Amino acid sequence: MAAGSPEPYPQEAPEGPCTFCVIATGEEPRDVRYEDEELLAFRNRLIWAPVMLLVVPKQHMTQQEFWISDLFAKAAKLAVRLGEEDCPDGYRILTNFGRDALQTQFHGHLHVIGGIALGLYLSHRLTAWPQVPPPG
């Protein structure tokens, strides 16, 4: 690693059990929207919008492993279905990768957020549209 480069972000929780693994096994209370042998969708305890759902694989895997897995397409379809059911006026499906994206859970997951006008995603940081140079 080059001098001055930030440490790579961890791929798993540094200590203690994985929060989403504990939730997936039912050891923690959860408000389930969908469950089968591979996936679990539940309401997030953190509430920044009226609808905040998490879609997680029951088997522990990192965000990167989840996105390249065969299970991801099934999870994405579920996220879309839940978004359509719970947020008929619009919703966001997103994932955070790493420290700069504020990833705090190192178990792969999708967020389904809506139930309110969400606005410009980075409006708190943007003062003008960024100028992106043309490729080449």
Predicted segments with their positions:
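HIT superfamily nucleotide-processing domains
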Residues: M1-G136
